[in-house]
Regions:
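Active-site nucleotide-donor binding segment shared across nucleotidyl transfer reactions
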Residues: 1-28, 37, 174
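Alpha-helical structural motif
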Residues: 36, 190-191
Length: 191
């Protein structure tokens, strides 16, 4: 499908430090360019075996994250954060990188975005959090869409995590792309 992916986060740390898993990280993490998400979503929804599923905010009403997951349907990974979801099996996290504002401008946007998502997705029984979630979410999405448009129009070459995720990632595009190979549990993956 010609989608550049690379191991990321704890998986990348484990590959560099241990050649594989690290004891305190219980999943696999990969990342892609956000612009590749629609193609990846379509490919995974059409081609995953029946015992696995693709999961994100477009496939599950109460999905509480701005990252995607590929889950095993025949397992249960009991995390309180995900108890309201239909599928809760073990998973691979799929993060996104996209053109980014400098961190000092991003942090307030991410903070509000995260609070809105949590308020809207039944993470709180407090009426005020739920109300503010629904009130501020459309405004936050508009701001994020404008920032993404700005990144495209001005060909921003600094990449950060997807909006709505606490992150300190803010690097030049050429630090990540083109991807290279790294050993992980005896296999080669892109990093």
């Amino acid at each position: 499908h010609k989608i550049d992916y690379f191991v990321d986060s704890g998986t990348l740390l484990g590959a560099v430090r241990h050649g594989g898993f690290i004891p305190w990280d219980d999943d696999l993490d990969i990342a892609i360019r956000r612009e590749d998400l629609p193609r990846l979503r379509k490919a995974l929804q059409e081609e995953l075996p029946s015992d696995m599923c693709y999961q994100d905010w477009t496939t599950e009403e109460n999905y509480p994250m701005t990252i995607a997951k590929v889950r095993d349907k025949h397992s249960i990974f009991d995390e309180s954060y995900y108890r309201m979801l239909k599928e809760r099996g073990i998973y691979i996290d799929i993060f996104f990188v996209e053109p980014s504002l400098p961190l000092w401008l991003r942090k307030p946007i991410d903070y509000v975005y995260i609070r809105c998502i949590r308020g809207m997705n039944k993470f709180s029984d407090r009426f005020i959090e739920i109300f503010l979630g629904y009130l501020c979410y459309p405004i936050t999405i508009l701001i994020v869409d404008l920032v993404r448009l700005w990144g495209k129009l001005f060909h921003v070459k600094k990449l950060g995590r997807q909006y709505g995720w606490k992150s300190s990632l803010y690097v030049n595009e050429n630090v990540i792309f083109p991807v290279s190979e790294i050993q992980y549990e005896g296999h080669k993956f892109y990093a």
